[in-house]
């Protein structure tokens, strides 16, 4: 396995797809990295030469990926919570941040249903 940005990328996949296993690298950024380095996107990772792997390592260092990106996102969220803005409070309460409805839906964000006892008549 080739190790790029601290991640073992899968050997059997095409380079274009394998680079997306790195957190912070999607298909668009993967294509950009490959065009900048001149590596063929259709080649498999196992067929890459050592010089190609070195080029890819150098190109990914130009971007914020993996741990640095996770830390940066976490700090941005913590900043919102510290200043007490609406977005920060919504993050803290594990509710949708961007104005979605919560009376129904929002199950992913709110977690599984908690059963509430019905009223006796």
Curated annotation (Swiss-Prot):
What's the superkingdom here? Bacteria
Q: Where is this region: Disordered?
A: 89-121
Q: Where is the composition biased (Basic residues)?
A: 100-121
Q: Which GO terms describe its cellular component?
A: cytosol; small ribosomal subunit
GO BP, one example? Answer: translation
- Which keywords does this chain's UniProt record carry? Ribonucleoprotein, Ribosomal protein, RNA-binding, rRNA-binding, tRNA-binding
- List the InterPro entries hit by this protein, alphabetically: Rbsml_uS13_C, Ribosomal_uS13, Ribosomal_uS13-like_H2TH, Ribosomal_uS13_bac-type, Ribosomal_uS13_CS
Cysteines engaged in disulfide bonds, as pairs: none
Q: What GO molecular function annotations does the UniProt record carry, in alphabetical order?
A: rRNA binding; structural constituent of ribosome; tRNA binding
Assembly information from the UniProt record: Part of the 30S ribosomal subunit. Forms a loose heterodimer with protein S19. Forms two bridges to the 50S subunit in the 70S ribosome.
Annotated family: Belongs to the universal ribosomal protein uS13 family.
**Role noted for this protein:** Located at the top of the head of the 30S subunit, it contacts several helices of the 16S rRNA. In the 70S ribosome it contacts the 23S rRNA (bridge B1a) and protein L5 of the 50S subunit (bridge B1b), connecting the 2 subunits; these bridges are implicated in subunit movement. Contacts the tRNAs in the A and P-sites.
User: What PANTHER family does UniProt report for this protein, alphabetically?
Assistant: 30S RIBOSOMAL PROTEIN S13/40S RIBOSOMAL PROTEIN S18, SMALL RIBOSOMAL SUBUNIT PROTEIN US13M
Q: What is this protein called?
A: Small ribosomal subunit protein uS13
Q: Which organism is it from?
A: Prochlorococcus marinus subsp. pastoris (strain CCMP1986 / NIES-2087 / MED4)
Gene that encodes the chain? rpsM
């Amino acid at each position: 396995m080739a190790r790029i940005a601290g991640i073992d990328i899968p050997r059997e996949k095409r380079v274009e797809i394998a680079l997306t296993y790195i957190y912070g690298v999607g298909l668009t950024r993967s294509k950009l990295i490959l065009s900048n380095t001149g590596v063929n996107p259709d080649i498999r990772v196992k067929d890459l030469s050592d010089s190609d792997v070195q080029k890819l390592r150098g190109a990914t260092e130009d971007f914020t990926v993996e741990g640095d990106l996770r830390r940066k996102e976490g700090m941005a969220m913590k900043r919102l919570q510290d200043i007490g803005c609406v977005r920060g409070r919504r993050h803290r309460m594990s509710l949708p941040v961007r104005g979605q409805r919560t009376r129904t839906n929002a199950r992913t964000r709110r977690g599984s249903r908690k059963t509430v006892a019905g009223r006796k008549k």
